[in-house]
């Protein structure tokens, strides 16, 4: 979690990066889906073709991890992941809805709003969550979902080229 101060922007940020295949074995297990995903997320996943479902569940998992990091807690550390619901706005962008312990944690640290961006590239998914208080002024130069995705794609392309076309998880996590 990163926290800024003053008017420099939203104060809480969480990021998660993973390979889509990391969840394959677990995502097939009913207990894991119940533990990680909200009922609306499970319903939506059930309507998708298998390859799209795999990508969807990985994206939602990364988004939940990013939101939990922005809340200052880890996965399975007092805030059930299923209480972080990643829905969609009318435009199709990810929409964060918190319930239960997740909503209480946000209130405890003064967060009124949390936004998340999810990007997929080949077998990687990244999610960035940003939380802020309504008392903080919104910045006029806040990046759009598309701008964040384009920036991620540019960093990933540079990192992949620098590694000779091979990007491992360990290297991805340590790349600047």
Question: Positions of the model-derived regions?
Answer:
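Core catalytic alpha/beta fold that binds nucleotide/phospho-ligands
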Residues: 1-176
